[in-house]
């Protein structure tokens, strides 16, 4: 949610959007479920936090580390995982076209659970 809610430098090729609207879409969802915010950006962040909160309430482990992946295993695989994610046909349907370096950064955050800590 957070990655796609930031205005991209380059839109994804598919589904050929002429304007970027992921932030507004997330804000609309946030409004629908009763979250508060003064801007679409604040509402998108409130929605991201709510999804994380719900995952914690359901007992979902939100990091690869907490799900048993060792740092050694992760470090060995992260470059290939980022490349494979970039090459996956579904990546082009993402609202934001990520760079391989951005995918690697997202994977690093997934390993550590950065940004999804329980409050």
What spans do the regions from the language model cover?
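C-terminal charged capping/lid subdomain of soluble metabolic enzymes
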Residues: 23-119
């Amino acid at each position: 949610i957070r990655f796609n809610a930031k205005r991209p430098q380059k839109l994804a090729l598919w589904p050929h959007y002429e304007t970027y609207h992921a932030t507004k879409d997330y804000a609309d969802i946030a409004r629908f479920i009763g979250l508060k915010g003064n801007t679409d950006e604040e509402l998108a962040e409130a929605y991201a936090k709510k999804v994380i909160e719900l995952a914690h309430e359901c007992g979902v482990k939100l990091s690869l580390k907490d799900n048993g992946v060792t740092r050694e295993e992760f470090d060995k695989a992260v470059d290939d995982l980022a490349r494979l994610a970039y090459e996956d046909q579904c990546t082009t349907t993402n609202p934001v076209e990520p760079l391989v370096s951005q995918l690697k950064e997202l994977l690093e955050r997934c390993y550590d659970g950065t940004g999804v800590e329980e409050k």
